[in-house]
Amino acid sequence: YSQKKYALSNYQFAVVFENCPILRKEAIFDFKPQETKDFNESLNMTKNNEEKAALWTLYGYYADPVEAIEKVYTIDPKNKHLTYLLTRAVNIEENNLNRSEYIKYTRKSYVNESKLDPKIYTLVSEIANKNNTLNPYMWQIVAGYFETLKGNYSKATTHLNDAKKTAPQKILVQNQIKLFAIFNQVSKTKVLNTQTENELLPNLVWLYNCNKQIENATEYYSRETSNDENKLRTDFLVSWSRSYISNLYKKQNNEVMSELFSREDNYYAKGERLEKMQTYFLENKNTAWDKLAQSLYTITLEDIYEYKGIMFAYKNQIDEAIIEFKKCKKLDTLYGNPFNGKIMDCID
């Protein structure tokens, strides 16, 4: 490469990539075709299909993974690098499709289905249906994922069921398929009522508990961190599902349930909303769905009483404030005496 023999250099990196797994990262990072003609010259140097597929794989990392998949699949449908290219292509698609924003108390996540590249959708569907790759279940998973994005929920279910049957019976793999099945199930839900809530409940309980377990294992590092159950990427699906359900409730004018699933930064700015939430908590609803929603929410009835008391105090309505504070059963200890705060080191 330093001698500006780019075609030869890149061909050699492809050989390393193909034959020396331990140096694959180095081969990827050092692969630098300058122009199309350099890449074509490298292709002409290949001695077999394996080298040619490796060269296209490196091309796919930097340029167009979808084109690379098409080329490698034509060379050899069972080539070992196809799975890597598929993963790369999906990651790029997700960067275009998925969006998250952090608004004070919560993370809200959205999926823009319209941004799905039709080229990769068509190619993955064709390959999945032919079922002749080295890891057919991975193509079934991605095909199912894409069908969900296209709104073809029955097709998605078929692909994911096929993936579940043919995939290795490992916890990580099977749970990953389950995540896509949950995404499909939530996506096809357009109205929330007792029936749809009960249908969603078991999978959402599993998902949110799984996410808590992963967060705890990550925060408090232990041997459990390396367990397969803790390697799942659940955070976006958790955030997206809560945002999606919250938006459905909002469309149905159910402000309380919408708030429980995804907090709004100004929800309590309106007194009528505060009263609705207080009434909800006082009704002490204890269905399994309500318990799930309440477990996701960080505000309690005591917090509402305290907030109301503070608001009354600001308005110099002391008697009303005392009434609200008496309802609040929280036994918090102040870090310092608020009446001698002017004294230095009052916290001590």
Predicted regions and their residues:
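Extracytoplasmic/secretory-pathway proteins
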Residues: 1-348
